[in-house]
């Protein structure tokens, strides 16, 4: 661990969503986590106290807005306010998983655009920069009027699969929306891509999964940004096997894995699911099929580059 930043004005704080990742990030940078307490009043309100001076410091807060989403968002907003009132020079919020990102547009009449609302709340509270990872909708970057560094998980995931030495790989997007992500993975692994085209022929009839691309006899690698209930990814894996894939792997950046997800993955044709630690994975979800990679080096390097006023774009590669 480097000690270059131990006595600097770079401060890293963690709230309650992902302390293990925050500790890994701080270790990569070469600093200890800042001292703060995050408690609850008797009625459930959040109480935060920063237990060291941060006047004139460049502060980075590590907080995924994952389950319980609303609790973690309120912790983050209150921490930002506390830092602002304590005269921090900059308040950089590091959100490995950005909750509410799936509500990025009005899909139906009279719906909110909640990802924009969250961006407004963070800015109004006093955030001066955002560092995040694999937004569900990249256009969310435009919801902010402060700098935002949008990191990608594809390099971490592709490096892992490259070391496995899999043969005859085809990268598969589980829907049309993920084609850009699949193409980035395919470019890194020098592999072709395939797309699963989901169609519902008529109301109350099960979706039909048509596969665009050649997957027969190949090792299929499904890639998505978020796996929530795992319905789409497991049905896609089954469709790939039925259409001739020799074996199926899957990967994602954000393992929400709610509801029946683990049971579905366990009983599916997926040989291995590779995820990152952008969201805490409870012990009961760490089944043999699930392999976790750390995003701490990537985020830690981004923090160093922001602090040193260096380019972050090199990390996109």
UniProtKB/Swiss-Prot annotation:
Q: Which residues bind ATP?
A: 43-45, 102-103
Q: Which SUPFAM superfamilies match?
A: PRTase-like
Q: Which residues bind D-ribose 5-phosphate?
A: 200, 224, 228-232
The reactions it catalyses are:
D-ribose 5-phosphate + ATP = 5-phospho-alpha-D-ribose 1-diphosphate + AMP + H(+)
Question: What are the required cofactors?
Answer: Mg(2+)
The pathway entry for this protein reads as:
Metabolic intermediate biosynthesis; 5-phospho-alpha-D-ribose 1-diphosphate biosynthesis; 5-phospho-alpha-D-ribose 1-diphosphate from D-ribose 5-phosphate (route I): step 1/1
Q: Which Gene Ontology terms cover its molecular function?
A: ATP binding; kinase activity; magnesium ion binding; ribose phosphate diphosphokinase activity
**EC supergroup of this enzyme:** transferase
Question: Where is the catalytic site?
Answer: 198
What are the alphabetically sorted keywords of the record? ATP-binding, Cytoplasm, Kinase, Magnesium, Metal-binding, Nucleotide biosynthesis, Nucleotide-binding, Transferase
Question: What's one GO-annotated cellular component?
Answer: cytoplasm
Fetch the InterPro entries from UniProt: PRib_PP_synth_CS, Pribosyltran_N, PRibTrfase_dom, PRTase-like, Rib-P_diPkinase, Rib-P_diPkinase_bac
> Could you provide one GO biological process annotation from this protein's UniProt record?
purine nucleotide biosynthetic process
Any note on cofactor binding?
Answer: Binds 2 Mg(2+) ions per subunit.
Entry's localization field: Cytoplasm
Residue positions annotated to bind Mg(2+) 2 are 175
Q: What is its EC number?
A: 2.7.6.1
- Per UniProt, Mg(2+) 1 binds at 136
Q: Does the keyword Isomerase apply?
A: no
Task: Supply the SMART domains for this chain.
Answer: Pribosyltran_N (SM01400)
**Binding partners and assembly:** Homohexamer.
What the record says about family reads: Belongs to the ribose-phosphate pyrophosphokinase family. Class I subfamily.
Report the PANTHER family cross-referenced here: RIBOSE-PHOSPHATE DIPHOSPHOKINASE FAMILY MEMBER (PTHR10210), RIBOSE-PHOSPHATE PYROPHOSPHOKINASE 1, CHLOROPLASTIC (PTHR10210:SF41)
* UniProt function note: Involved in the biosynthesis of the central metabolite phospho-alpha-D-ribosyl-1-pyrophosphate (PRPP) via the transfer of pyrophosphoryl group from ATP to 1-hydroxyl of ribose-5-phosphate (Rib-5-P).
Q: What is this protein called?
A: Ribose-phosphate pyrophosphokinase
This protein's species is Corynebacterium ammoniagenes (Brevibacterium ammoniagenes)
